[in-house]
From Swiss-Prot:
Its main location: cytoplasm. It comes from Oryctolagus cuniculus (Rabbit). Belongs to the phosphatase 2A regulatory subunit B56 family. Residues 30-41 have a biased composition (Low complexity). It is found in: Cytoplasm. InterPro entries: ARM-like, ARM-type_fold, PP2A_B56. Keywords: Acetylation, Cytoplasm, Phosphoprotein. This is Serine/threonine-protein phosphatase 2A 56 kDa regulatory subunit epsilon isoform. The B regulatory subunit might modulate substrate selectivity and catalytic activity, and might also direct the localization of the catalytic enzyme to a particular subcellular compartment.
Length: 165
């Protein structure tokens, strides 16, 4: 019989007071989009004239049509799909922000429900599932919203809408 010393199996010590001892390996969070809604076919928005290019008598109706178009939600996880329409919606949102900032009396009783509908379609959404149960703001990166280019403009529009009256 050999009397070679045997080493005990390795045992990791667990510090019950430190969350680091229980923490899983960290993975980098990728961008996610809470606005993904499966669409079978590419989204087509009908190009509309600019608000400044139509007579003032036609602007309220065109404003409502543009608000309705901005209710369309795109899949920002697929960066190559609907590029033209995503850009069109972004420019329309910019135009709407400028329009309610500059124009006096453009918001009528008829426009309020459409404004609320457009804002709610874009802002109220299901958040993406969390990658882990724990979130440490000091060490973890926040989940990035892929649709932020449109969301930022919707928030800006909503702020201008609230300030306009």
């Amino acid at each position: 019989m050999s009397s070679a010393p045997t080493t005990p199996p390795s045992v990791d010590k667990v510090d019950g007071f430190s969350r680091k001892s229980v923490r899983k390996a960290r993975q980098k969070r990728s961008q996610s989009s809470s606005q993904f809604r499966s669409q079978g076919k590419p989204i087509e928005l009908t190009p509309l004239p600019l608000l400044k290019d139509v007579p003032s008598s036609e602007q309220p109706e065109l404003f409502l049509k543009k608000l309705q178009q901005c209710c369309v939600i795109f899949d920002f996880m697929d960066t190559l799909s609907d590029l033209k329409m995503k850009e069109y919606k972004r420019s329309t949102l910019n135009e709407l922000v400028d329009y309610i900032t500059i124009s006096r009396g453009c918001l009528t009783e008829q426009t309020y429900p459409e404004v609320v509908r457009m804002v709610s379609c874009n802002i109220f959404r299901t958040l993406p599932p969390s990658d882990s149960n724990e979130f440490d703001p000091e060490e973890d990166e926040p989940t990035l919203e892929a649709s932020w280019p449109h969301l930022q403009l919707v928030y800006e529009f909503f702020i201008r809408f609230l300030e306009s009256q």
